[in-house]
Amino acid sequence: MYKLWLLFDPRRTLVALSAFLFVLGLIIHFISLSTDRFNWLEGKPAVRA
């Protein structure tokens, strides 16, 4: 396993992985917001008990 880090710079690899996961999270949230079922910003108002 240590030979893998000899091929790739750990700093650049972890920064690239973090950026990828952040963008993936944004994409997933925007896809959820575009649906009627999972849009928590413009959803139906809460029913009072």
Swiss-Prot record:
Keyword set for this entry? Antenna complex, Bacteriochlorophyll, Cell inner membrane, Cell membrane, Chlorophyll, Chromophore, Light-harvesting polypeptide, Magnesium, Membrane, Metal-binding, Transmembrane, Transmembrane helix
Stated membrane topology is: Single-pass type II membrane protein
Please tell me where a bacteriochlorophyll binds in this chain.
H29
Pfam families on file: LHC (PF00556)
Molecular function GO labels: bacteriochlorophyll binding; electron transporter, transferring electrons within the cyclic electron transport pathway of photosynthesis activity; metal ion binding
State which ranges are Cytoplasmic (membrane side).
1-12
Q: Which GO terms describe its biological process?
A: photosynthesis, light reaction
Record topological domains on the Periplasmic side: 34-49
UniProt-annotated location(s) = Cell inner membrane
- A GO CC term? plasma membrane light-harvesting complex
Which Gene3D superfamilies does this UniProt record tie to the protein?
Light-harvesting complex
Q: Where does the source fall among the domains of life?
A: Bacteria
The UniProt transmembrane annotation reads 13-33
Q: Which SUPFAM superfamilies match?
A: Light-harvesting complex subunits
Q: How does it assemble?
A: The core complex is formed by different alpha and beta chains, binding bacteriochlorophyll molecules, and arranged most probably in tetrameric structures disposed around the reaction center. The non-pigmented gamma chains may constitute additional components.
Give the record's family classification: Belongs to the antenna complex alpha subunit family.
Function as written in the Swiss-Prot or TrEMBL entry = Antenna complexes are light-harvesting systems, which transfer the excitation energy to the reaction centers.
Q: Name it.
A: Light-harvesting protein B-880 alpha chain
Source species = Rhodoblastus acidophilus
